[in-house]
Regions:
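Short intrinsically disordered, low-complexity coil segments enriched in acidic
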Residues: 1-7, 55, 62
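A residue-level signal for conserved active-site and pocket-lining positions in enzyme catalytic cores
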Residues: 1, 16, 96, 127, ...
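Short, basic and Ser/Thr-rich N-terminal targeting/leader segments
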Residues: 18, 58, 143-144
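Active-site catalytic microenvironments for nucleophilic, acid-base chemistry
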Residues: 19, 36-40, 129-136
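Acyltransferase
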Residues: 116-163
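DPxDG-like acidic metal-binding loop motif
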Residues: 2-29
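Catalytic-loop motifs flanking and including active-site residues across diverse enzymes
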Residues: 8-12, 81, 122-126
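Surface "functional belts" at beta-alpha junctions
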Residues: 23-121, 149, 154-155, 159
Length: 163
């Protein structure tokens, strides 16, 4: 599942950084999605970026970033309804992206809501974020770094175990 894939990727990155004696830089998926949205869309005015990852049913993992990718609203799990983000939408345009945004399009109806489809972050989109972290010396401890899960990771054994 996604937890296992994330743990494998983090373990590989930690091993490479340790072996090559290079710093480990973590890039949050939602921040990366916001960055990719900025690179692939062009808005002259001051907008907010709200990347969303589908968390099943009407729940999404989300955060809100400004044009400089500063967090305006922290990462959170959110059940989306018609009043979600109303405070932000009242003041300015908000660009929603990611697979979680697609299911929210019919629920969040506001003239300041912009839904952008088909934003898939690429490794090249990560460069600006990694460079900023490098310049600011924001490195992770290779020995103790753990993936950031919004929900608690619970390891289970499959019910239908086939031998």
């Amino acid at each position: 599942g996604s937890y296992t894939g994330l743990r494998i990727g983090v373990s590989e990155a930690k091993g490479l950084c340790f072996g090559l004696k290079v710093p480990l830089i973590a890039v949050h998926t939602l921040e990366l999605l916001a960055c990719a949205t900025m690179f692939k869309t062009y808005f002259d005015e001051d907008v907010l970026y709200c990347p969303m990852i589908d968390a099943r049913r009407m729940e999404v993992y989300t955060a809100v970033y400004d044009n400089a990718l500063n967090a305006v609203r922290p990462v959170q799990a959110c059940v989306v309804d018609e009043n979600s983000f109303a405070d932000l939408l009242a003041d300015r345009r908000v660009v929603f992206s990611g697979n979680g945004a697609a299911k929210c399009k019919e629920v969040i109806r506001h003239e300041n809501a912009i839904f952008v489809d088909d934003i898939v972050p690429l490794a090249t989109d990560m460069l600006a974020l990694a460079e900023r972290a490098y310049r600011q010396g924001q490195f992770e401890d290779v020995a103790y770094f753990e993936p950031f899960y919004l929900k608690e990771f619970i390891a289970t054994t499959p019910k239908n175990k086939v031998l």
